Regions:
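Core alpha/beta nucleotide-donor-binding catalytic domains of modification enzymes
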Residues: 1-172
Length: 172
């Protein structure tokens, strides 16, 4: 359960899932710091930044922004995740926040279960935990019971702009 008096860092990409979580957090009156990492891997990634920056400004929210321009040639997804999570933790410490909010949803959970089964991964649970810790910082995932389509619908109903990352449409 989230503490309504606490400050949280919320990871936002500009997609429907994170924009829905951001809007919901703002609607609930939570004190949030919007954290965005721009990897510059897509031609239009700066448009994601502009969207998130505009939302943060229009709602009087603080924005923590990291630009990443160099990578090693290894697994980009794993590297991006490490960069992102470390930045979120740094932001938690900078603002003395209580934890990190991420918009992982039911589709992500199903995908993770399928990957765990395909890899025969032994884990204490299947899917994604609603609460985990990264470098001692709590990571909350309040949208795990909601499908991405429903988060997009919420954005449409609430008039919250979002962007579709074309790389998420590719088969992995």
């Amino acid at each position: 359960k989230l503490d309504p008096q606490a400050t949280y860092v919320i990871g936002v990409s500009g997609g429907p899932d994170s924009m829905a979580l951001l809007h919901l957090a703002v609607s609930m009156g939570l004190d949030v710091i919007v954290a965005l990492v721009n990897y510059h891997k897509r031609v239009d990634s700066d448009l994601d930044y502009e969207l998130v920056k505009a939302y943060a400004k229009s709602h009087g929210l603080r924005l923590a922004y990291l630009e990443v321009n160099e990578y090693t040639k290894e697994n980009f997804q794993a590297q991006a995740r490490t960069i992102r999570y470390r930045f979120f933790v740094e932001t938690v410490h900078r603002y003395q926040a209580k934890g990190i909010l991420l918009a992982h949803h039911a589709d992500d959970c199903v995908e993770t279960i399928l990957m765990q089964k395909a890899r025969h991964t032994r884990v204490p649970y299947l899917g994604i935990a609603p609460l985990s810790y990264y470098q001692g910082v709590p990571v909350y995932r309040p949208c795990l019971g909601v499908f991405k389509e429903d988060l997009a619908h919420y954005c449409e109903v609430e008039g919250v702009a979002y962007r579709i990352d074309s790389s998420n449409l590719e088969n992995h």
